[in-house]
Amino acid sequence: MSRPAESAIHPASNLLPGFDHKKLRTTGADINYAVGGSGPPLLLLHGNPLTHVSWHKVAPSLAERFTVVIPDLRGYGDSSKPDGGEDHSAYSFRAMAQDNVELMRSLGFDRFQLAGHDRGARVAFRMALDAPQAVSRLAALDIVPT
């Protein structure tokens, strides 16, 4: 089972007061994330070409009522950039969704609320389809249908 790494000083610390910055090795990638607050778990997924820091204006306020988890999707920010392979499956929405289900489980959250922006919303939809038992609510922001 994956385990969270120890906290480290992160350059974004001043933008996310009260958040701990950590890394987790999932099945397919090393995921950089920040976690803060207390209450029901809320996972926020950023869009393209952003990082977890894109939530810095709302995450501290949300952390007053929720345990907020904000990762860098694989390939973004300080998360690892695995080889995509010929079919690019390492960067599929399914692979990114699995990373984040593993992340939330490693933090003790088998069920959580989820919000995604842009690419993060696509990952959120995939997660709700692949792991419906994990997602209690889903909000999608700025997503273009394909």
What are these model-predicted stretches?
Residues M1-P41, E64-F66, Y91, D110:
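Alpha/beta-hydrolase fold catalytic core
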Residues S13, P60, R94, L103-S106, ...:
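A general structural signal for stabilizing positions within well-ordered secondary structure
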Residues G18-H21, T51-H52, R119, F125-R126:
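Tryptophan-centric aromatic hotspots in well-structured domains and transmembrane helices
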Residues D20, P41-L44, V69, A115, ...:
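Conserved Rossmann-like nucleotide-binding pocket used by diverse enzymes
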Residues T27, I70-R119, P145:
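Active-site loop/oxyanion-hole signature of alpha/beta-hydrolase fold enzymes
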Residues A29-P82, L103:
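Conserved HGGG/HGGXW glycine-rich cap/lid loop of the alpha/beta-hydrolase fold
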Residues R65, L107-T146:
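Conserved hydrolase catalytic core segment
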